[in-house]
A protein has these predicted regions:
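Beta-strand-loop-alpha "switch" segments that mediate conformational coupling across diverse proteins
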Residues: 148-196
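Short, conserved loop/helix-junction motifs that constitute active-site signature segments
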Residues: 106-109, 134-139, 170-171
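NTP-binding/hydrolysis catalytic cores, primarily Walker-type P-loop NTPases
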Residues: 192-220
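Inter-motif core of Ras-like GTPase G domains
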Residues: 101-121
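Conserved C-terminal guanine-recognition region of P-loop GTPase G domains, centered on the G4
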Residues: 125-139, 144
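Structural beta-sheet core signal
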Residues: 35-36, 92, 115, 143-146
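P-loop/Walker-type NTP enzyme "switch/lid" segment
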Residues: 4, 8-14, 21, 25-92, ...
Length: 220
């Protein structure tokens, strides 16, 4: 059977939805069958696909996307039970909060939680709060993906210290992947088209540890 991968964080602006869509396309381009569920109230990824289809109505779909909008926790539990029986991976774009009534059901069924982050103190504090709650109740393996990192700023001493502090702290909760640089090639992705060479190169080192976990095992 496939795995359930949740893209999640309570801190906005870290690129959760974008990375979720790019990850799904990366898997599809690598020959893996994958489906996506948009569980976020804003439905950003679902609307992104809708816009892409309006501009390219004859394009084939590299992956299907469905939503949980309007679903009760009881309905979501049935959906998750069915998703876990599928022979391929399912990627879920989770709500950016801890109060959505469906989150407990999603998290309890997830094999992997991917948490995009920035190195700043506000993001780190919010992420640590999230991890304390998550690790206390759920068994999914956590991968932190430093995303949208500005290379020039990363060389400044105080930002290097922020980065080192973030990595050291988060290692207590999960795996910190190589970072993804801030780049327009990522934000310009299309949910229908294969990733360009530039896009693949931008994310491949960050995605490799997650894909290895998909291939090797599920929950801890």
């Amino acid at each position: 059977m496939g795995k359930i991968v949740s893209y999640t964080n309570v801190k906005g602006g870290v690129g959760k939805t974008t990375l979720c869509g790019v990850f799904a396309t990366y898997l599809a381009n690598s020959g893996r069958t994958v489906a996506v569920v948009d569980a976020d109230l804003q439905q950003s990824l679902f609307r992104h696909r809708k816009r892409d289809l309006q501009q390219n109505p004859d394009a084939s779909l590299p992956w299907e996307i469905n939503t949980l909008r309007g679903r009760t926790p009881e309905e979501t539990a049935i959906i998750m039970d069915n998703l876990k029986l599928l022979p391929y991976d399912v990627i879920i774009d989770c709500p950016g909060n801890l109060v959505d009534p469906n989150l407990e059901v999603i998290y309890s069924n997830a094999d992997i939680a991917v948490v995009p982050i920035h190195y700043d103190s506000d993001t780190l504090d919010a992420t640590q709060m999230f991890c304390e709650t998550f690790k206390a109740h759920f068994g999914a393996k956590i991968f932190f993906v430093p995303n949208g990192i500005v290379s020039v700023e990363e060389r400044r001493e105080h930002l290097q210290q922020e980065r080192d502090r973030a990595i050291e702290l988060l290692k207590a909760y999960g795996t910190v992947t190589p970072r993804i640089k801030r780049s327009v090639v990522i934000s310009d992705y299309n949910t229908l088209f294969p990733l360009t060479t530039y896009q693949r190169n931008a994310v491949k080192y960050a995605f490799e540890p997650i894909i290895n976990e998909l291939q090797e095992g599920g929950e801890e």
